[in-house]
A protein has these predicted regions:
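N-terminal leader/targeting pre-sequences
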Residues: 47-77
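Short regulatory "switch" loops immediately downstream of catalytic or recognition motifs
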Residues: 69-82, 131, 230-232, 251-253, ...
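N-terminal type II signal-anchor transmembrane helix
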Residues: 1-46, 51
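Short, hydrophobic/aromatic-rich segments at coil-to-beta transitions
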Residues: 200, 240-247, 344-350
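Secondary-structure transition motifs
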Residues: 68-228, 297-324, 441-449, 457, ...
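Extended terminal
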Residues: 2-15, 277-286, 306-307, 311-472
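Extended lipid/amphipathic-ligand handling interfaces
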Residues: 42, 52-59, 87, 99-116, ...
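Flexible, solvent-exposed coil segments and beta strand-coil junctions
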Residues: 84, 185, 245-252, 315, ...
Length: 472
């Protein structure tokens, strides 16, 4: 009993001693981990200027809070490595990353095992802005370059890293089609040790993208996102290279004039992704995710729809209502599909059906859109609702009866609508290509000219035209 009491006393003394040591070490590290240290580290890695308002580390909790972060183009202050107090405020830039606060929690014990285990990264109020030119190059690209100067001294790694990135860009431009080589901006080998991340959460944010060629603007607002269960081992990417993605927000496409709105989509994305390509270690250039377009999302102006409507004037003249194509297009219900993204090229991984205004649009597999220069190739079909289709058939018969008589009306109507009828509904397969804002659209089936259809109808039964005239 006495031995147990003595042991307990010793244990308490040891725990007190450990607590004092941890507190002392925490105080020491807290004094070392400040904003200048973090700024210096980041500016030594990339071609950026970093501004931070405050840093609050806690060794006991394994937590660091970083507030008021601004990342933008590099300037002379960053090149010289001056401390924050010696710098003037950053010049406002259209290319920027601003974050109100980042909270980072790690498992300190795992660091002694050469493993980085991150419990959570919480990003609050993200503000990201950049532009994309017609070649697919974005204004963030230069920020990912290695810095030429670090603390006023020429970076010995600059030429090697710069050349590696330039070679990757040349390979990217020389390759043709959709199969572009890997982006050399980041490699898994730059991850210092096997890394796991329980969760990365974005609490509110917005992204603004300027498309230089068209002058259009893309805004992603009300952003909520998460990456969970990240598992990356740079030495074993075949088995440790995955993460679970979750993202939602409103995507709005605006014209060069700020009041011109093309579309507004409420989106959700989720699924398992591979951050790196296993063979090369570079960022995976071909991300595939499950995307849901929410009910009520709308397309205010769609050039493809307008051009498609112009090719159907013969059918419109006989009774087909094309206003459902030209009017405001509203998504009828939540629609989920797989979408691939490779070097700013969006493609349908599988057929993409969407119900709009009671009608169905289906984009065929491998249809694609280059979001950088608006080039596209889309194979699709537009199927009118049963109500509109039946009304078109009835109006067509009435119109043709007045024009050529009832005896020929049915035959002519059949000649006009048979090529574009599927399962009792008017079904228009079509192809769209070229500039998305000025597309070349053509139906994939041959449409009958009204005059030719009337001639063919009369040939089938010459006497019917006379009978039709007598019936009037």
């Amino acid at each position: 009993m006495k031995l147990r009491i003595i042991s307990t006393k010793w244990l308490i003394l040891i725990l007190i001693f450990v607590a004092v040591c941890v507190a002392a070490l925490s105080a020491f590290l807290s004094s070392k981990i400040d904003r200048d240290l973090i700024i210096s580290y980041l500016e030594s890695e990339k071609n950026i200027r970093v501004d931070i308002e405050d840093v609050s580390p806690s060794l006991i909790l394994g937590e660091v809070n970083i507030g008021g972060i601004i990342i933008g183009p590099r300037d002379s202050y960053a090149d010289k490595g001056l401390v924050a107090e010696q710098r003037s405020k950053p010049v406002p830039s259209k290319t920027r990353i601003k974050i109100s606060n980042v909270s980072l929690k790690v498992r300190l014990v795992d660091l002694f095992l050469d493993k980085l285990s991150i419990k959570s990264i919480i990003i609050e109020d993200l503000d990201l802005a950049y532009s994309i030119n017609e070649d697919g190059d974005h204004s963030l690209d230069s920020l990912l370059d290695p810095p030429k100067y670090i603390k006023g001294v020429l970076n010995p790694e600059y030429e090697r890293k710069k050349k590696r990135r330039e070679l990757a860009k040349i390979r990217w431009k020389l390759d043709s089609g959709l199969k572009n080589p890997d982006d050399d901006s980041f490699n898994a080998s730059e991850v210092p040790m096997p890394t796991t991340l329980d969760e990365l959460i974005i609490k509110g944010g917005r992204v603004a993208i300027k498309l230089d060629k068209s002058g259009n603007n893309v805004y992603f607002s009300k952003v909520k996102g998460s990456i969970t269960d990240l598992d990356v081992d740079p030495q074993n990417l075949k088995e440790h290279n995955s993460a679970l993605l979750g993202l939602e927000g409103n995507l709005k496409v605006m014209g060069s004039e700020s009041n011109l709105e093309y579309a507004s989509f409420d989106l959700k994305a989720d699924g398992i992704i591979q951050p790196f390509e296993a063979s090369s270690g570079f960022l995976n250039p071909d991300l595939i995710t499950s995307l849901t377009v929410m009910e009520g999302s709308k397309i205010v102006s769609l050039p493809i729809a307008t051009r498609l409507a112009s090719t159907l004037e013969q059918l419109e003249s006989t009774g087909l209502d094309l206003s459902v194509i030209d009017d405001l297009l509203v998504v009828d219900n939540d629609t989920t599909f797989s979408l691939g993204l490779r070097n700013y090229i969006l493609r349908a991984v599988e057929p993409l059906p969407v119900l709009i205004n009671g009608n169905q649009i289906i984009l065929e597999k491998n249809s694609w859109l280059n979001t950088a220069n608006d080039e596209h190739l889309i194979n699709a079909s537009f199927t009118f609702s049963d109500k509109i289709s039946q009304k078109a058939f009835e109006k067509s018969y009435e119109y043709l009866s007045e024009r050529v008589g009832k005896g020929v009306a049915s035959a002519v109507s059949e000649l006009l609508f048979t090529p574009v009828t599927k399962k009792g509904k008017i079904h228009i397969p079509f192809v769209s290509s070229g500039d998305f804002n000025r597309p070349k659209v053509r139906p994939s089936v041959e449409l009958k000219d009204l005059a030719d259809a009337i001639k063919e109808g009369i040939k089938k039964d010459p006497l019917s035209i006379l009978k039709g005239l007598l019936d009037r």
